[in-house]
């Protein structure tokens, strides 16, 4: 039997191909549960999950909540807007307070990179990173991988083009790490101003043209233009950005006929993607949302149940 040797899920970095495959296989089982009429199980009955979101979220928070509830856990959503954080309490103080309540897992989203890793050092329960600044978003990468694997039957040797605001995207970073670990060919397509320095050292091919970057791609993953994280003029205008880097039906023709169109959400229609593509036959955006619940069920079960059946480490380095 294969064991998952980690107490926390802080990032994709630190996971092996075997770890990733284990979680994806678990998630496949969770998909079956989610498609049943009776979706609730007793797997995590008696265990407590606290969702601690310091950044606004709709999909991710709802997905984690639903995952916990479908496994039978007691789930609490902590509203940061009404919490002691607004009164000046630090993240560490909040962590220590919550830890004293003896939860079994904390799910955290925070605007600062490294927040999840810091939390994991201060609490005695498992920690799941739901996105920390521009660092990582591991469950998003896992759900994207599950979506691709279920549609294509594999992850190795497929060509994935990640397009758009790579610079500010924790989703891009986690996907690059995961896809490389699983043997995929990864391309990034973006203007130079929206690419981090040293991106080529992450094992990706860099393109500045959508036509060139999408050629023969099996998967096209569009990223949102994250204007809320921008402090300067990274693009001349939204209109010009869409002209050169937006995905419409004509641009999509450069990819394979059976290419998958993906987007982590929320989408900016008419900015990075056209409605005709987002709602078109090649889009698997709705499937990504469904796979998100399954992946988070798999992560929760693995950290809180499966890991107790074998040796584990104290966590992963972010």
Curated annotation (Swiss-Prot):
Coiled-coil segments: none
Keyword Transferase found: yes
Binding-site positions, L-aspartate: 87, 170, 224
PROSITE patterns, per database record: CARBAMOYLTRANSFERASE
Pfam families found in the cross-reference section: OTCace, OTCace_N
GO molecular function terms attached to this record: amino acid binding; aspartate carbamoyltransferase activity
GO BP terms in the entry: 'de novo' pyrimidine nucleobase biosynthetic process; 'de novo' UMP biosynthetic process; amino acid metabolic process
Residues the entry annotates as binding carbamoyl phosphate: 59-60, 109, 137, 140, 265-266
EC number(s) recorded for this UniProt protein: 2.1.3.2
Pathway: Pyrimidine metabolism; UMP biosynthesis via de novo pathway; (S)-dihydroorotate from bicarbonate: step 2/3
GO-annotated cellular components: cytosol
Keyword annotations: Pyrimidine biosynthesis, Transferase
InterPro entries: Asp/Orn_carbamoyltranf_P-bd, Asp/Orn_carbamoylTrfase, Asp/Orn_carbamoylTrfase_sf, Asp_carbamoyltransf, Asp_carbamoyltransf_Asp/Orn-bd
Catalyzed reactions: carbamoyl phosphate + L-aspartate = N-carbamoyl-L-aspartate + phosphate + H(+)
Biological role stated in the UniProt entry: Catalyzes the condensation of carbamoyl phosphate and aspartate to form carbamoyl aspartate and inorganic phosphate, the committed step in the de novo pyrimidine nucleotide biosynthesis pathway.
Family membership noted in the UniProt record: Belongs to the aspartate/ornithine carbamoyltransferase superfamily. ATCase family.
NCBIfam families, sorted: asp_carb_tr (TIGR00670), PRK00856.1 (NF002032)
Quaternary structure (record): Heterododecamer (2C3:3R2) of six catalytic PyrB chains organized as two trimers (C3), and six regulatory PyrI chains organized as three dimers (R2).
Protein name: Aspartate carbamoyltransferase catalytic subunit
């Amino acid at each position: 039997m294969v064991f998952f040797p980690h107490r926390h899920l802080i990032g994709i970095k630190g996971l092996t191909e075997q770890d990733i495959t284990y979680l994806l296989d678990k998630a496949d089982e969770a998909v079956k549960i989610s498609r049943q009429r009776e979706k609730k199980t007793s797997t995590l009955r008696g265990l407590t999950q606290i969702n601690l979101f310091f950044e606004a979220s709709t999909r991710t928070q709802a997905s984690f909540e639903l995952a916990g509830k479908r496994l039978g856990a007691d789930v609490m959503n902590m509203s940061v807007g009404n919490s002691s954080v607004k009164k000046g309490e630090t993240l560490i103080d909040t962590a220590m307070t919550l830890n004293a309540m003896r939860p079994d897992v904390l799910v955290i989203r925070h605007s600062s990179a490294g927040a999840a890793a810091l939390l994991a050092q201060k609490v005695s329960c498992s920690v799941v990173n739901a996105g920390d600044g521009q660092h990582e978003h591991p469950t998003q990468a896992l759900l994207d991988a599950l979506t691709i694997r279920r549609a294509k039957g594999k992850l190795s040797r497929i060509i994935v083009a990640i397009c758009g605001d790579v610079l500010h995207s924790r989703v891009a970073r986690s996907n690059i790490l995961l896809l490389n670990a699983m043997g995929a060919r990864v391309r990034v397509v973006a203007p130079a101003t929206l690419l981090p320095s040293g991106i080529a050292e992450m094992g990706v091919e860099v393109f500045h043209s959508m036509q060139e970057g999408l050629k023969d791609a099996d998967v096209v993953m569009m990223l949102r233009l994250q204007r809320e994280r921008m402090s300067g003029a990274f693009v001349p205008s939204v209109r010009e950005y869409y002209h050169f880097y937006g995905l419409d039906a004509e641009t999509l023709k450069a990819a394979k006929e059976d290419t998958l169109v993906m987007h982590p959400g929320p989408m900016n229609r008419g900015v990075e993607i056209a409605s005709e593509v987002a709602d078109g036959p090649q889009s698997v955006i709705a499937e990504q949302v469904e796979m998100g619940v399954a992946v988070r069920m798999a992560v929760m079960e693995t950290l809180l149940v499966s890991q107790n059946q074998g040796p584990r480490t104290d966590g992963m380095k972010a």
